[in-house]
From Swiss-Prot:
Substrate binds at residues 96, 140-142, 199, 260, 364. The keyword Ribonucleoprotein does not apply. Disulfide bonds join 205-206, 266-315. Cleaves beta-linked terminal galactosyl residues from gangliosides, glycoproteins, and glycosaminoglycans. It is found in: Secreted. Pfam families: BetaGal_ABD2, BetaGal_dom2, BetaGal_dom3, Glyco_hydro_35. Glycans are attached at residues 156, 405, 422, 621, 740, 775, 914. Belongs to the glycosyl hydrolase 35 family. The gene is lacA. Keywords: Carbohydrate metabolism, Disulfide bond, Glycoprotein, Glycosidase, Hydrolase, Polysaccharide degradation, Secreted, Signal. GO terms for cellular component: extracellular region; vacuole. This is Probable beta-galactosidase A. SMART domains: BetaGal_dom2. Its main location: secreted.
Amino acid sequence: MRLLPVWTAALLAAQAAGVALTHKLNGFTITEHPDAEKRELLQKYVTWDDKSLFINGERIMIFGAEIHPWRLPVPSLWRDILQKVKALGFNCVSFYVDWALLEGKPGEYRAEGSFAWEPFFDAASDLGIYLIARPGPYINAEASGGGFPGWLQRLNGTIRSSDQSYLDATENYVSHIGGLIAKYQITNGGPVILYQPDNEYSGGCCGQEFPNPDYFQYVIDQARRAGIVVPTISNDAWPGGHNAPGTGKGEVDIYGHDNYPLGFDCANPDVWPEGNLPTDYRDLHLEISPSTPYALVEYQVGAFDPWGGPGFEQCAALTGYEFERVFHKNTFSFGVGILSLYMTFGGTNWGNLGHPGGYTSYDYGSPIKETREITREKYSELKLLGNFIKSSPGYLLATPGKLTNTTYTNTADLTVTPLLGNGTGSFFVLRHSDYSSQASTPYKLRLPTSAGQLTIPQLGGSLVLNGRDSKVHLVDYDVAGTKILYSTAEVFTWKKFHDGKVLVLYGGPGEHHELAVSSKAKVKVVEGLGSGISSKQIRGAVVVAWDVEPARRIVQIGDLKIFLLDRNSAYNYWVPQLGTETSIPYATEKAVAASVIVKAGYLVRTAYVKGRDLHLTADFNATTPVEVIGAPKTAENLFINGKKAHHTVDKNGIWSTEVGYSPPKIVLPVLEDLKWKSIDTLPEIQPSYDDSPWPDANLPTKNTIYPLRTPTSLYASDYGFHTGYLLFRGHFTANGRESNFSIQTQGGQAFGSSVWLSGTYLGSWTGDNDYQDYNATYTLPSLKAGKEYVFTVVVDNMGLNENWIVGQDEMKKPRGILNYELSGHEASDITWKLTGNFGGEDYVDKVRGPLNEGGLYAERHGYHQPYPPTKSKDWKSSTPLTGLSKPGISFYTASFDLDIKSGWDVPIYFEFGNSTTPAPAYRVQLYVNGWQYGKYVNNIGPQTRFPVPEGILNYKGTNWVAVTLWALEGSGAKLDSFKLVHGIPVRTALDVEGVELPRYQSRKGVY
C-alpha cells in the first residue's frame, strides 16, 4: 500500500487529535471542527461523524433513490414505486419539488390532488423509507425553467441571487412547502432526515458575486424559518467545495456533490471513454469536508436523452448492469456514506413540465422503467448491491485506502482499493486497471486477514474477473458471530434465524470462488451435488472452493448454511423486512435482522406475520416457484397476496410453493375504428376570425436579460403565458410595397412555428434540436393597398430553459416572437394580439395544474377533456389518420372503453407510426382524459410510444383520447398509424386509485 500524501496524513492526524483545521481550497477558507457534537444542532435525531449519519443514535449508510412524484400524477402509484425502491435494499429516497407546478400564479400556492405531497410522505413513512427533501427553490431536474415558474421571467432582479425581488418571490413557495416538509421531519415522527437548500449552486458569471454567502445563507435561513431543523446538505455539481462546512456564511451541515461519470452519449452505449472513472474523490473529500460523511447526493444510474436522440433503451444500455458493477462499487471504494442514485425512477414529462432539451418520456434509462416495470437487468443488479450494503454494517467502519494494482493481486491488469477494518471486516474493491476492459483476466489475491497474509485461492485454481465487472472481496466479515475469514464470492445477504444462520453468496458465469470460515466444523453439502465442491481445514479455518453453476448448492458449516448461487439465480431473491399489514419499519439494525429471505421471481413487496400466518405480497410475470428461507418460528401457514398457499417444508427448513400465472385476455380497442370527431383548432388563420377578446400585446417587457427589438413585447411570459402552443395575430394596413416578411421566433430546442397571412400559408420552421430560435423570411403575395391584413403565427413552446449558471438568467429566455420585419413598413405598423393557455396564470383547470394546456382553440375551450360538445355544428366526423390536406391544425377526439381484470398491472401505450421516409413534418399533442401525456414530433423523434398509467387511464370504464395534429408542410399531414398497445401483464398485489378526471364544462369568457 502506498503511503498517504503528507497533507492527507497530517489532516488525519489532526482529526485524531481533535484539532480544528483551517486550510485553503479553491479560494475558500475551510475551518473543520472534528467533533460533530460540538456543532450547534437544532435536533438530536440525525447526527453524523466523518463516516456516516447516525439516526436515533444508530450508525447508518444512506443508500437512496432519486424519484420525482410529480412526474407520475397518480398518488396511489407512488406507493408502488417506493415499494420497489425498498425491495432494492435501499433505505432512502431523495426528491425534488417543482415550484412551477405549485405556484402557477404569484401568491397562489396550490398543492391538492395530484400535486399534494402528503400521500408521498405518508407512503414513505408507512414503508420505512427516509427522505432527503430537495425543494430548491431551484432544482434543475430537466424541468421547465429548472422548476422556476414562468412568471419569474418578469422579475426585476437576478435569479438565484441576493436581489431582494428574487428572495421575496420565493417566500410564499418556501414558507408553504418548507412548512409541510417540516411537519414530516423525523423530529415529528416523519421520514425527512435531511434538507437540501437550492441545487448545484456551483457556477456564476456575468458580474454576479459567486459564490454569494449572503444569498445561500438566506436560503438556509428561509428553510429554518419554515420550521426545518434537520441537517442541511449540499449538492455541488462537482467536488468544488462550494458552501462546505467551515466556509463561513452560507455553509451547510454536510457537504455533498453529484457525479455523472459516464456522461450521456446514449448513441454509443458500449463506449466507456478513457479516464471517466473517478479515482480521486476520497482525497478530494478529505480536502473539502473531512469531518462529514462522504456524500454523493446525485450519482448516475441513468442518462437523459434529447430530441432526436437514440432513445432511452440506449441510455439504459449505457448505464446498465455492467456500469453499476464497475461504477457503483467504485463509489464504495471511496467510503461513501450517503449515496443517492439519479434517476432510480424517472417518470413522464406530462403536461408540458419538461425543459426544451428533452421530450415527453423521462424514463432516463432508469432501473425502474417509466411504465414502473422492473424488467431491466440493472434493477436486479442494483438489488444485489443494495442488499449487500444493508447486510454489511462493517463497511462504514472500514477506512478507505489507496488504489493499487500490485499490492493485492498478482497482475497489474487489475486494480484493488482496500477499505481496511479494525476487527470489523475489510473490503477489497477489485476492477480492471483499464476500467473499460472487456477481457477475462485470471488472478490470485494476496489479502491481509486475522490469520495472516494469505494467497487466494488456497485450494488451487485461479480466480477470474470478466470484462466490465468488479468485485468486492471480503476479509474478516462477521455473520452473526461467525467469522468469514475471506470470501471471493460476493455477498447478497445474510441472516440469523431461530434455527441457524444463512449466508447467500453469488458469482458470475465461468467463475471459480473460494470461501474460508473460521471454524473447525465439518463441511456438509445439504442441497445439490457435492462433486463440484472441495474443502479443507487450514490453520483453524474451513476452506471451501467451487465453480459457479446455475444449480443452487447449500453448504453447511456448523450452524451456518451457505447458499452458493450464480448471479442470475441471485436476481430472484428478495429480503423483505417483517412489518405489519400496513407498515414496514425503517432499516434499523433490529428491523434489518427481522427479515426473511424469499426466492420469488419478479417482485416481493412486503412480508408480515399475523398470528400463525406469514403473509407475502408479491408480483408475478410467470409461473413462479416461491421459497421462504427463515420463516418465523411462530408461522405455520403461508399466504400470498391474501390467499392461502399450500407449501411444503424441506429438510433445510425451506418453505416451498408455486404461484401460477395465467394472464387475462386483454382486448384493447382499435383506435382507427373509433367514432372520431374533429374540429378546426386553428380558426385564427381565417380573415374573418374575431380576436378582439384576446390580450393586446402592448406591454413593454419586464425581462431584464433580453431587451426588446420590437415596439412592444411579444414575449409570452410578459402576458402570463408560460406553457404549450402560443398564438400571435399581427394586424396591419397594406400599402402595396410589401414583398417579404421576416420573423424570428423562439420556442426552445426542437420547436416549430408556422405563419399565415390572412388565410394564406407562408411557411414553417419544422424544427431542429440544435436550434432554440429561428429567423425565417417568407415571400408575400401581392397585397392591396389600404386593405387590412393579419399575420397568424403559431409557436411551439417546448418549455423554459433551466437556470444553472448564476448571472445568465437562462430561464428568462423568452418564448414567442423576438423580432420581425415587414418590407415597406415600420415595425410599429403592425399591432399584435396574443394568447396561450386560457386564463394564463389564472388557469381554469386546477386539477391538472398550470402547465397542462396550451393556447390552441380546442385547448382554450377545454375540448381535450372528457365528453366535449361534439354534437354542435362545428364538429365533423374525421380521424387523425385522414388528417389534413393542407397546413393547419386540427383537433380530434373519441371515446373508448377498457375492461382490464383487477389484480393485474398492465402497461398501456399510445403508439404513433412513423414509416414514411423522409418523415413528414407534423406535431401531435396527446390528451388522455384531459391530461396531456405526449408531445410527438414526427420529423425529429425519437419517441413514438407514450405510456399512460392506470389512474389517468380508467382501466374499468370509459376513456377519452384527443390529439391535436399540426401540419407544418404544404401537403398537410396525417398519422401513419395510431394504436393502443399493452405490455406484459403482471399479476399484482397493487391497488390503484384513479385521479380526478373533470369533464368538459363551458368556460366563461372563452375565446
